[in-house]
């Protein structure tokens, strides 16, 4: 979505990708960027970490977006670029554990963005600005905009488990969340072409579904949006499909959920989008 919104800056834009391959490269190509416009490092895992895994040790969390921030800053300096443009949304600010400020997506949050910018100002300041273009929007608004670009449907991918094979595993909370989000705007035939099956017609995803939707249930530790966005998407998906509903939609409809508030006019003013990148032409309508 960011690449499409910034089309008028195409000639001066580079795509920064760590370990460029598969879906990331294909999306860049669809946006009109050939190999000469794709830059980024190769990232490898220390063999010692793999050996510890073999010994039974668990992996810690990798704040990948923080890795992107610091490494992209180096590339921006080397290539003489003024802006590092991310695509993190307002929804990434929501915490994951009820009653506690625990955010699995901290390195995608406004808090991290502010912290990183402060660090740059204090230690590295040379005019390079790091910001997220999509921060003012909810992920629901981004999805609404994304579906207007069907050329990306065959190539985009956002599943951690399927990242190495450029596929949707269609068996995790992230896949279910994206399926729900898009179900507000797309029919099941189109969604099945993307995911390989109708995820809303699977009883085994009840617990994951409830974690994404219900208050009092902790959200899955995946990069997913807010429960308000999920409820709005489900409401729209149910209206779109009429009386013939897949299992999870039918189950949810029986709870008689209240009509959710529209997010069409949502706009998070706590953002660092600079001028001349004006938001007057970036509304999600």
What does each model-identified segment do?
Residues 280-285:
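Conserved small/polar residues in nucleotide/adenosyl-binding loops
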Residues 175-191:
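Iron-sulfur (Fe-S) cluster-binding segments and ferredoxin-like electron-carrier domains
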Residues 148-167:
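Immediate flanking context of iron-sulfur cluster ligation sites
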Residues 1-151, 178:
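ATP-dependent adenylation/nucleotidyltransferase module used to activate substrates
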Residues 161-163, 191-202:
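Active/binding-pocket-proximal capping segment
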Residues 216-260:
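Short flanking/linker segments adjacent to small metal-binding domains or redox-active Cys/His motifs
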Residues 165-177:
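Local cysteine-cluster metal-coordination motifs and their immediate loop/turn environment
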Residues 160, 204-210:
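Predominantly late transmembrane helices and immediately cytosolic-facing juxtamembrane segments
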């Amino acid at each position: 979505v960011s690449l499409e919104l910034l089309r008028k800056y195409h000639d001066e834009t580079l795509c920064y990708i760590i370990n460029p391959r598969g879906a990331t490269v294909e999306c860049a190509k669809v946006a009109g960027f050939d190999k000469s416009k794709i830059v980024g490092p190769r990232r490898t895992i220390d063999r010692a970490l793999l050996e510890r895994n073999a010994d039974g040790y668990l992996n810690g969390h990798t704040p990948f977006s923080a890795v992107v921030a610091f490494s992209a800053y180096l590339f921006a300096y080397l290539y003489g670029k003024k802006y590092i443009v991310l695509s993190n949304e307002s929804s990434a600010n929501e915490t994951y554990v009820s009653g506690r400020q625990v955010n699995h997506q901290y390195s995608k949050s406004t808090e991290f963005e502010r912290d990183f910018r402060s660090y740059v100002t204090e230690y590295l300041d040379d005019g390079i600005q790091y910001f997220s273009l999509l921060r003012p929007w909810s992920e629901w608004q981004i999805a609404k905009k994304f579906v207007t670009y069907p050329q990306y449907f065959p190539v985009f991918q956002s599943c951690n488990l399927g990242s190495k094979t450029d596929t949707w595993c269609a068996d995790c909370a992230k896949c279910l969340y994206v399926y729900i989000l898009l179900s507000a705007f797309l029919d099941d035939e189109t969604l099945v072409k993307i995911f390989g099956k109708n995820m809303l017609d699977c009883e085994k995803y009840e617990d994951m579904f409830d974690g994404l939707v219900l208050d009092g249930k902790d959200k899955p530790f995946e990069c997913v949006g807010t429960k308000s966005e999920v409820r709005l998407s489900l409401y729209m998906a149910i209206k779109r499909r009429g009386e013939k509903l897949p299992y999870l939609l039918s189950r949810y409809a029986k709870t008689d959920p209240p009509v959710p508030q529209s997010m069409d006019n949502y706009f998070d003013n706590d953002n660092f989008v600079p001028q001349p990148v004006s938001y007057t032409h970036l509304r999600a309508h």
